[in-house]
């Protein structure tokens, strides 16, 4: 079935969406507003890429530039190597048909059945009746709503409505699917179901999925690439794993703090130190779980003792990452070796206190 409903496979450039030094400005009564400022990014064909930012970061403008609803003030946006801004509206229509989109509020026609909602873009594209019926049947099966074909949207749950939205967005076999805050109105369990379906869209159909979100949990669950926007600037481009393991911007670090266990604050540090009076507390940030395990194995051979006294772990696209606080004790030289080992695997490994490291005769038991 996946082969039947996938986009047509013709040779295409591997860089599916490219922003080249894109700036977008809007004129207002109070002056010029710069929505995007010199943004350059590349979204690979067949990837799941997330664009994350707070309200006003420029996410919506970026989406409208991808589907050609806005043109850059300067720079270029290339989709499949084509600069939409150089085309007439007529020339852009077939290219826009290659981009599907789903929304936070579903945007379904309440007076139409689920079948007719999915049929809508096919009718606009003048599909033959037999082909239209076959396509809708395939899509409703793919999203798990075959039994709901003749229901109306008000008979469906939020998650089911978003599944209809996905089926409709895929109707004309687009090679790109834009998901604009598509899970923001859903509960966590339903969000997970929708994200799982988007993964299938990508894996089984080969569709390039671009997720626009303000939720780091969505990025963690689905993204291979991530672009972090702040006040119109691209502050963190790269793979999702890079962003989680080695966040370069304060914005990314704040987003990460919402989903991964943070290091102890001052009061918690004081409590942990009082519970481990002879230990040196070391924070280890954004470390891969397997690397952390290897580091602890090496520390066990230094003569230092260790105990994990605080921490949290998250699963990301291709592994797991964690923040930990480790209590180290033993001979001073051994503890220094242990700190160096932790620094090798950590984005940031540093003592949280200036506690005196005990000598061998003082060592805690």
Task: For every predicted segment, state its role.
Residues 219-221:
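A short, surface-exposed alpha-helical micro-motif characterized by mixed small hydrophobic
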């Amino acid at each position: 079935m996946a082969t039947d409903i996938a986009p047509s496979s013709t040779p295409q450039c591997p860089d599916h969406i490219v922003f080249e030094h894109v700036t977008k400005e809007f004129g207002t009564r109070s002056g010029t507003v710069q929505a995007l400022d010199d943004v350059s990014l590349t979204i690979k064909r067949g990837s799941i890429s997330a664009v994350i930012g707070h309200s006003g970061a420029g996410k919506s403008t970026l989406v409208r530039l991808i589907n050609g609803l806005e043109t850059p003030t300067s720079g270029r946006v290339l989709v499949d190597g084509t600069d939409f801004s150089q085309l007439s509206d007529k020339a852009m229509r077939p290219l826009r048909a290659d981009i599907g989109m789903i929304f936070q509020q579903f945007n379904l026609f309440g007076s139409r059945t689920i079948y007719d909602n999915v049929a809508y873009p096919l009718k606009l594209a003048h599909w033959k009746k037999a082909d239209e019926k076959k396509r809708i049947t395939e899509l409703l099966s793919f999203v798990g709503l075959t039994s709901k074909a003749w229901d109306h949207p008000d008979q469906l749950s939020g998650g089911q409505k978003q599944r209809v939205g996905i089926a409709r967005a895929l109707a004309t076999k687009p090679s790109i699917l834009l998901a604009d805050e598509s899970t923001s109105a859903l509960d966590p369990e339903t969000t997970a179901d929708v994200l799982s379906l988007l993964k299938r869209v990508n894996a089984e159909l080969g569709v390039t999925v671009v997720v626009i979100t303000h939720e780091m949990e969505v990025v963690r669950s689905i993204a291979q690439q991530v672009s972090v926007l702040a006040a119109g600037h691209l502050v963190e481009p790269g793979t999702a794993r890079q962003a989680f393991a080695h966040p370069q911007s304060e914005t990314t670090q704040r987003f990460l703090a919402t989903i991964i266990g943070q290091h102890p604050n001052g009061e918690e540090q004081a409590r942990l130190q009082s519970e481990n009076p002879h230990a040196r507390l070391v924070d280890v940030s954004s470390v891969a779980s397997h690397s952390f395990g290897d580091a602890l194995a090496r520390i066990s051979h230094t003569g230092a003792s260790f105990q994990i006294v605080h921490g949290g772990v998250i699963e990301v696209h291709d592994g797991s990452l964690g923040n930990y606080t480790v209590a180290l004790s033993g001979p001073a030289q051994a503890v220094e070796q242990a700190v160096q080992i932790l620094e090798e695997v950590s984005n940031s490994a540093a003592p949280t206190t200036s506690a005196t490291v005990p000598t061998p005769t003082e060592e805690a038991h």
